[in-house]
């Protein structure tokens, strides 16, 4: 098994989605530099590949320093619930505080991961847009299969609602009602709802002093 390192590794590089421009060596260099500054960037849909990369980066940074905060920057349309929950569980597993920042677009599982950052350390840029909705899935097969899939979907929906309620201060009933259809939030509205703690415009408001020194700022 190849050990995790702070240098670039293919498993840690952003995944190009169909139709996207494939990552260049310059992109790989940027990803490595961000990782060296304890910044994890989720800039694609949430799937098994991107979740494995984010989980690996979180574990790596925690192994290097179990006390300094890690920043998770999110610009994602969402995606797989199970992949997103893997990231959430890893955030809970490590002793570090993981701050979150919405930049551009945080929808569905992107919104969920934004909301579950460390208390007091969940941020959004002024023009970020956040969208919440309930999990969905294609259901098919035999009657028995459909029943099993429906039960699993309901279980997952309840888990997401419970966790979101814990981190936003809203009730599970409110989360269920508001997520029944796509609901859009501005950065300020997300703050009022409890998804983020602050709307920020400066790096000084996001990065701890020790991290800024590491970046030479």
From Swiss-Prot:
PROSITE patterns named in the record: CLP_PROTEASE_HIS (PS00382)
Database matches in CDD domains: S14_ClpP_2
Localization (cell): Cytoplasm
Catalytic machinery residues: 108, 133
GO biological process terms held by the UniProt record: protein quality control for misfolded or incompletely synthesized proteins
Primary localization class, coarse: cytoplasm
HAMAP family hit by this protein: ClpP (MF_00444)
Protein family membership: Belongs to the peptidase S14 family.
Protein name from the UniProt record: ATP-dependent Clp protease proteolytic subunit 1
